[in-house]
């Protein structure tokens, strides 16, 4: 018997694709499996948002096309938001999906502030209702975690499988800090690499430049429009934060990297709708018929859409930039190619037109430091020598090497 009382709620939606939802919500667990997740509900679907320490944020969208029925009726608000524990929802959906040999239909419902978030699971024999208490918190402070689309420094589209393999390799070698390196040349020799910095030193993973792996790579002059060649863009990130996208890249067909001049990296992950199911080998699975285990997703469903924004750890200095350039010019045999230091986009430089910033690395009081002339130095040294009654020897004494 189907339960129709949920149709009176402001929001209700039904689906049979529980394993797909399990796969999607699992991408949130690296950002805190037992932490709060902020859910936005509107006419287009459900968005799940998590933020960690104001340095990285994930937003995952489940489009309304995933659901057999989808209803959003709210005359006063264009969206509703609530906060729950992500592991509560994930555990309920995954357990019901694995413990039933029948097709399970899941109905989600919510009736606004103060009401519980309800999940109803139904198969041919039973119906189970689960209610989760909800509460409201302030929106996550995303100031500084928004990509400046008018000041993009580079953009790359990468095959998801290749990126996941690279991240897995970085994890296995104990990467602590990660450099993202992007450079284009006029002869279409594009270079996109992930560079590991660990106790073992530097290691680089250079992605193949063929379009089947690196579909697109463009370096901009900091304005999102002017494409330039021969310039390297280098981002520096803490690998603990950077590695949080690895689980999402496992289901990705394509991954879009965009980095702005402020050091914000945006990672857009799009999954294909035909092969996003990931089997959890740590849990026993019932032998269900293949037609039930692999239910066809709706043709108009765009797939799991994920956006991750993260802040650069710090701005790297010129010495580190040169070191990375030398590493990229060294081949697999340890031989260095004809090294030609390329121009690197300085995204944190001071204003060249500001005279108060010239030659003043410490920026003391915003004033320009005046260096003493050689003549003044000689006068000061002579006066000090006279006071100390010291005389320098003549220059006729031979110098021995």
From Swiss-Prot:
Compositional bias of kind Basic and acidic residues: 371-393
Superkingdom classification of source: Eukaryota
GO cellular component annotations of the record: checkpoint clamp complex; nucleus
A GO BP entry: double-strand break repair
Effect seen on changing residue 128 to K: In RAD17-1; UV-sensitive
One of the Pfam families matching this protein, by short name: Rad1
Keywords of this entry: DNA damage, DNA repair, DNA-binding, Hydrolase, Nuclease, Nucleus, Phosphoprotein
Location within or outside the cell: Nucleus
GO MF, one example: nuclease activity
Keyword check for DNA repair: yes
Family: Belongs to the rad1 family.
Miscellaneous remark of the record: Present with 189 molecules/cell in log phase SD medium.
The protein's name in its UniProt record: DNA damage checkpoint control protein RAD17
Gene label: RAD17
């Amino acid at each position: 018997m189907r339960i129709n009382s949920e149709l009176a709620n402001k929001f209700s939606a039904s689906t049979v694709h529980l394993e797909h939802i399990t796969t999607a919500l699992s991408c949130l667990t690296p950002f805190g499996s037992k932490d709060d997740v902020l859910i936005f509900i509107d006419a287009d679907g459900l968005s799940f948002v998590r933020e960690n320490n104001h340095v990285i944020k994930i937003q995952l969208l489940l489009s309304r096309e995933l659901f057999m029925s989808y209803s959003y009726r709210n005359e006063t608000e264009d969206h509703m938001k609530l906060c729950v524990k992500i592991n509560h929802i994930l555990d309920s959906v995954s357990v019901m999906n694995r413990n039933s040999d029948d097709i399970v239909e899941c109905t989600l419902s919510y009736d606004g502030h103060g009401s519980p978030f309800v999940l109803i699971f139904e198969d041919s024999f039973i119906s189970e209702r689960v209610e989760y208490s909800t509460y409201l918190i302030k929106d996550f402070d995303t100031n500084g975690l928004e990509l400046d689309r008018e000041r993009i420094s580079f953009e790359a589209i990468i095959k998801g499988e290749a990126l996941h393999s690279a991240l897995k390799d970085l994890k296995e070698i104990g990467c602590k800090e990660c450099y993202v390196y992007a450079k284009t040349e006029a002869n279409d020799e594009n270079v996109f690499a992930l560079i590991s910095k660990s106790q073992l030193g530097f290691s680089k993973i250079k992605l193949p430049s063929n379009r089947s792996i690196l579909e697109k790579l463009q370096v901009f002059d900091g304005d999102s429009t002017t494409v330039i060649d021969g310039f390297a863009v280098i981002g520096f990130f803490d690998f603990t934060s950077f590695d949080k996208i690895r689980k999402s890249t496992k289901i990705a067909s394509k991954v879009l990297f965009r980095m702005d001049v402020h050091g914000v990296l945006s990672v857009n992950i799009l999954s294909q709708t035909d092969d996003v199911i990931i089997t959890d080998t740590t849990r026993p699975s019932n032998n269900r018929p293949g037609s039930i285990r692999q239910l066809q997703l709706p043709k108009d469903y765009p797939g799991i859409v994920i956006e991750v924004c993260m802040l650069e750890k710090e701005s790297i200095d010129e010495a580190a930039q040169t070191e990375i350039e030398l590493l990229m010019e060294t081949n697999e045999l340890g031989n260095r190619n004809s090294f030609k230091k390329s121009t690197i986009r300085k995204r944190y430089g001071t204003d060249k037109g500001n005279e108060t910033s010239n030659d003043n690395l410490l920026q003391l009081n915003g004033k320009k430091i005046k260096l003493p002339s050689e003549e003044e130095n000689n006068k000061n040294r002579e006066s000090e020598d006279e006071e100390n009654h010291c005389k320098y020897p003549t220059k006729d004494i031979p110098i021995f090497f």
